[in-house]
A protein has these predicted regions:
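Bacterial N-terminal signal peptides that target proteins for export
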Residues: 2-12
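Bacterial N-terminal signal peptides
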Residues: 11-22
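Long, low-complexity intrinsically disordered regions enriched in Ser/Thr, Asp/Glu, Pro/Gly
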Residues: 2, 15, 158-159
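Mixed-charge, low-complexity intrinsically disordered regions
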Residues: 4, 24-27
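Mature extracytoplasmic or otherwise solvent-exposed domains
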Residues: 27-162
Length: 162
């Protein structure tokens, strides 16, 4: 009788090990359930929202949002007007933001990252201050856990018509 128990015990142990590894393999498959963007807001910032599934419980993941951005800055006088020939500049380049997010008991993470307009070095003369005239974001995407989600469209806002 003992000879029959030993193979059964080994078989049960092997099945438990296989199921444990299968659960880890399924949990280690991060993927985006959704990704979207909204804005730009009144500060020219774009909000990138996402939901990732396929993580283990209480697993921390680094998520990065990125885009190609173009911003126009100009000098505006203290009266709130632009001179007839305003000093202005256009700045283009990649922008990104990253954050660490921890999954809950369901192996999912929902979050948001904020992209800011590219910085400028525009210097305004006395009596004037630099303002953001317009901003545009394209090729927006969010990455995390080895997966990438593209967010189609161009997200633009014009603050002043100069």
């Amino acid at each position: 009788m003992r000879s029959h128990r030993r193979p059964t015990t080994v078989l049960v142990a092997a099945l438990i090990a296989i199921l444990a590894f299968a659960a880890v393999a399924v949990a280690a498959n991060p993927h985006f359930l959704r990704a979207s963007a909204s804005g730009p807001d009144r500060n020219g910032e774009l909000s990138v929202n996402f939901k990732i599934a396929g993580l283990g419980d209480n697993e921390t993941i680094t998520v990065t949002a990125s885009a190609d951005a173009t911003a126009v800055y100009a000098c505006r006088n203290n009266g709130g007007n632009f001179p007839s020939d305003p000093k202005k500049t256009e700045v283009s380049g990649p922008v990104s933001a990253s954050g660490d997010f921890t999954s809950g008991r369901n192996g999912q993470v929902s979050g948001s990252l904020t992209l800011s307009p590219p910085a400028t070095t525009l210097s305004c003369p006395g009596g004037q201050r630099r303002v953001l005239v317009s901003v545009s974001y394209s090729n927006v995407e969010v990455t995390g856990g080895g997966d990438t989600a593209a967010i189609p469209g161009t997200f633009s806002r014009v603050f002043f018509d100069i």
